[in-house]
Regions:
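Substrate-binding cleft of extracellular glycoside hydrolase catalytic domains
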Residues: 33-157, 161-163
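Short acidic loop-to-helix transition motifs that present clustered carboxylates
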Residues: 23, 45, 174-176
Length: 228
């Protein structure tokens, strides 16, 4: 069956006022109903993993791996990815990654996937407990239309799946509901949607099951703070 996750973006690093993008995850209710995690990239700077682990508030992490640059004709690795990957592994934090998409068409999406696959294989940073997510939310992509955006998304994900990776799709809920044909996405894709609602105060909401039937991950805030 589908694994369910939720996400609370941008949890702050202690002493720096930076924001880590964080997550709540629900995998197997038999063991634990809700799992909290963080979503991080270069925007959060250097994370204090010792404090992060000691806080006992984080069950997993999803980190930005990078993006394909059309101008540079190469895959650009997020400047903090390799450090975050290494320290997540050292601290036994279950890990997933996401690629930010700038694809204009199916061919671009396949190129993004193949360049990511090449990087993962060449770097050896390719062991993940959680899916590889396709982050599709660029304003310039909206004009392509629902079908094209969905075709782009599926092209990336199927290329990654064929290389042996679990996959998922990330965007904000309005995008997923209005700019994509999400019912076309295969059932084995994890779906991660951001919706901060009207009470975006950084606290874990009481209605954590709000999107349990819609998304596998619900990203519910960009205001939360944790040690690390």
């Amino acid at each position: 069956g589908r694994r369910n996750y939720d996400d609370q973006r941008k949890l702050g690093t202690v002493g720096k006022g930076l924001r880590i993008e964080g997550i709540k995850i629900r995998i197997v209710s038999k063991y634990k109903k809700h799992y909290i995690g963080i979503d991080v990239s270069h925007w959060q700077g250097d994370i204090n993993y010792e404090k992060l682990v000691a806080s006992q508030k984080i069950d997993f992490m999803i980190t930005k791996v990078g993006w394909y640059s059309e101008n540079n004709k190469r895959f650009i690795v997020d400047s903090k990815f390799e450090k975050n990957y290494k320290l997540a592994k050292q601290n036994k934090i279950p890990l997933g990654i996401y690629l930010y998409s700038y694809a204009k068409n199916v061919e671009d999406a396949k190129l993004e996937a193949n360049e990511l696959i090449k990087y993962l294989k060449s770097s050896g940073n390719s062991s993940f407990e959680l899916p590889i997510f396709y982050d599709i939310e660029e304003d310039s992509q909206i004009s392509y239309g629902k079908k094209a955006i969905t075709d782009i998304t599926i092209a990336f994900c199927e290329t990654m799946k064929n290389a042996g990776y679990e996959v998922g799709v990330y965007s904000y809920s309005y995008w997923l509901n209005n700019y994509m044909e999400i019912l076309r996405l295969p059932a084995d894709y994890s779906l991660w949607g951001a919706d901060y609602g009207t009470n975006n105060n950084g606290q874990i909401p009481s209605d954590l099951d709000k999107y349990s039937k819609t998304y596998d991950i619900w990203q519910f805030t960009d205001k939360a703070q944790i040690d690390g």
